[in-house]
């Protein structure tokens, strides 16, 4: 079966594993998924991410993060720009998620960035997802 939106698939796998409080999950790897996972790690939404070589496309193993009382760190994920309806934001229109409590992930000419990084670099791009 052909996967039409691999980023949405990754976000759905994270959302599903998070809902049942799994410790880790695996997704087929790609460069953009790897960069999104690194942003989630850097922003404190996941504990760790590792790349596993399997002589094909590779696998990303994502370790989810929970609070001291087993509460979820990721409360929501939403795919914004989809293959059927792309959503772009200019440099001065980069969205804020929950007044800065969450992050927006953008694909820009300078790589995959968070909304804060895009504002600092004064660049716009395709709004991939919101995470809060």
From Swiss-Prot:
One of its GO terms (biological process) is translation. One of the primary rRNA binding proteins, it binds directly to 16S rRNA central domain where it helps coordinate assembly of the platform of the 30S subunit. PANTHER family: 40S RIBOSOMAL PROTEIN S15A. Keywords: Ribonucleoprotein, Ribosomal protein, RNA-binding, rRNA-binding. Belongs to the universal ribosomal protein uS8 family. Part of the 30S ribosomal subunit. Contacts proteins S5 and S12. It holds the Pfam family Ribosomal_S8. The keyword Nuclease does not apply. This is Small ribosomal subunit protein uS8. The gene is rpsH. InterPro entries: Ribosomal_uS8, Ribosomal_uS8_CS, Ribosomal_uS8_sf. HAMAP family: Ribosomal_uS8_B.
């Amino acid at each position: 079966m052909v996967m039409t939106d691999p980023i949405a698939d990754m976000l759905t796998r994270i959302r599903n594993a998070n809902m049942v409080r799994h410790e880790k999950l695996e997704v087929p790897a790609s460069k953009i998924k790897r960069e999104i996972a690194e942003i989630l790690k850097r922003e404190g939404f996941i504990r760790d991410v590792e790349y596993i070589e399997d002589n094909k496309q590779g696998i990303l193993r994502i370790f989810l993060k929970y609070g001291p009382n087993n509460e979820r760190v990721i409360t929501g994920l939403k795919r914004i720009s989809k293959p059927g309806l792309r959503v772009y934001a200019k440099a001065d229109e980069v969205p804020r998620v929950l007044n800065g409590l969450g992050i927006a992930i953008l694909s820009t000419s300078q790589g995959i960035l968070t909304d804060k990084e895009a504002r600092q670099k004064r660049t716009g791009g395709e709004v991939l997802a919101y995470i809060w």
